[in-house]
Regions:
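His/acidic metal-ligating clusters that form di-metal
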Residues: 32-49, 130-210, 239-242, 250, ...
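Active-site environment of divalent metal-dependent phosphoester hydrolases
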Residues: 12-15, 57-62, 84-92, 126-129, ...
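Acidic, His/Gly-rich catalytic cores of divalent-metal-dependent hydrolytic chemistry
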Residues: 208-209, 213-265
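N-terminal active-site segment of His-dependent metallophosphoesterases
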Residues: 1-66, 106, 164
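Extended active-site neighborhood of metal-dependent phosphoesterases/phosphodiesterases
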Residues: 61-142, 179-189, 215, 230-244
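Active-site neighborhood of phospho(di)ester-bond hydrolases with catalytic His/Asp-centered motifs
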Residues: 6-8, 48-54, 78-84, 122, ...
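Short glycine-enriched, charge-decorated loop/helix-capping segments at active-site entrances
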Residues: 18-24, 97, 127, 166-173, ...
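Active-site-proximal beta-strand elements of phosphoester/diester hydrolases
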Residues: 2-14, 115-125, 154-157, 209-215, ...
Length: 265
């Protein structure tokens, strides 16, 4: 059994700055890490952590230092992809010592695990809130799929390859979706797609595969389907996702806070 934890949209700011003058994102991330420590005896060995973008809110070197100082207390191999708030070059520099990130170009990578393959895709368009699966990323994924020969894949990118229904988030969504879907359709193995960006857990079918977006440790966006919905965030510590392989993928949301109980019934 292979277990990967997905953490997304931590939005760490340099020097402890409050994000939007509201959110102590470093403190919220510390609470999430403490929760992971709390449940480790319950879930067993965790093989890897995937941070699915927007590790930083401001793309600064110091914000990545803070992120690493917090996550390293877990002593679990951690793999990262950039989101729209990240700096590709500074993210690369911060995690280059781990050896899986390419030295130049997009931060697309592949790591084999015991029961499945973990692939990270770079959807960042520098300076833009929306994302893109460009031709180089499509070629990278196509080549990997051909080499993996239908083996199961946990595939991560920051921007969801589907519409959320939240208008102001869909306006800064993913470009190149049609070509991305075509590559996915060509793969005969099981793919579990995981992403971030929309700060909500959502589940969709994308090109015949299950796709999930992760909650965020500090904030969420109201699921308001109206065109005139207010643009803004809700303060809520909404947890993370656990993905495991046991004769197929299973994905579970785990809250940052334990709650009361368990009580007998």
């Amino acid at each position: 059994m292979t277990i990967v934890l997905q953490i997304s949209d931590t939005h760490i700011a340099a020097h402890g700055r409050l994000v939007s003058d509201q959110l102590d994102t470093a403190s919220a991330f510390e609470s999430l890490v403490k929760r992971i420590i709390q449940i480790r005896s319950e879930i067993g060995k965790v093989d890897a952590i995937i941070a699915s973008g927007d590790l930083s809110d401001d793309g600064t070197t110091n914000s990545y230092e803070i992120f690493k100082n917090i996550i390293e207390t877990l002593d679990i191999p951690t793999f990262v992809i950039p989101g729209n708030h990240d700096s590709r070059s500074r993210l690369r520099d911060a995690f280059s010592v781990d050896g899986y990130l390419p030295k130049v170009g997009k931060l697309n990578w592949h790591v084999p695990l015991a029961d499945f393959h973990l692939i990270g895709l770079d959807s960042l368009v520098e300076g833009m809130p929306g994302g893109e699966v460009d031709t180089s990323t499509l070629a990278f994924l196509s080549d990997k799929f051909e080499a993996l020969d239908s083996a199961p894949v946990l595939l991560a990118l920051h921007h969801p390859p589907f519409k959320s229904g939240i208008k102001f988030m869909d306006e800064i969504g993913l470009q190149g979706v049609r070509h991305f879907h075509n590559v996915l359709k060509s793969y005969n193995g099981e793919v579990r797609l995981i992403c971030g960006h929309i700060h909500n857990l959502m589940v969709m079918n994308v090109a015949g595969h299950v796709a999930l977006s992760a909650p965020a440790p500090t904030s969420s966006f109201s699921y308001n389907l109206q065109d005139n919905a207010l643009k803004g965030f809700m303060r809520i510590e909404d947890g993370f996702l656990l993905h495991r392989w046991s004769n197929g993928f299973q994905s579970v949301r785990i809250s940052t806070h334990k709650g009361e109980g368990p009580f007998p019934f």
